[in-house]
Amino acid sequence: GLGDVYKRQILQDQYNLLDCLLVGTVLNTFINNSHVVKIACMAQLVNVIPAISTVKNGISWRQSVYYPLYFASLYGRGESLQLKINSPKYSSDIADDVNYVDASAVINEEEKTLSFFIINRSEDESVDLDFDINNLPIIKIIDQQIINHTNIYASNTINKPNEIVPKKTNIATFQKENLIAKIPKLSYLFILLKIK
């Protein structure tokens, strides 16, 4: 009957690491174009095309796409900085000379922080990051977390709710006035810096 239609799970997609990287890239596009994009929302948050999944009388868990949303929501507030990115490139059916590295940065004068949201889209290679930040009064690295996995199709499920999660890392360091890191293939890196 009609009641059975409402009991079925509809559009309860399972998101993997690639979806996480895609959402991170889309959010970077919004941040990098914040002079035009004034607000961006996630329409479905729970169960239907979800960032969070649940089961009846059971647990809830965060999908892989939740985490780029989380970092952008908390730390993507302030003024977007225009980054000049020079990374290895690839070509596709629709574009040539596409950077493997996609990134955005937000400075929050009120909180005295600088946030970086960085994606390495290369399927094969780590990429060296080298941001020249000599004009910014950096005090220290507050936090850095990475999302990656050996299986690009790995996802969070009811049985493995923490398969794709951010992990603390220390791959980013300062050398003179540059922020450097070797970003693993197919990964999302969040870096939070304290500024004066």
Locate the predicted segments by residue.
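Short, hydrophobic/amphipathic alpha-helical packing segments
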Residues: 19-27
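The substrate-binding groove and active-site-proximal loops of carbohydrate-active enzymes
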Residues: 8-20
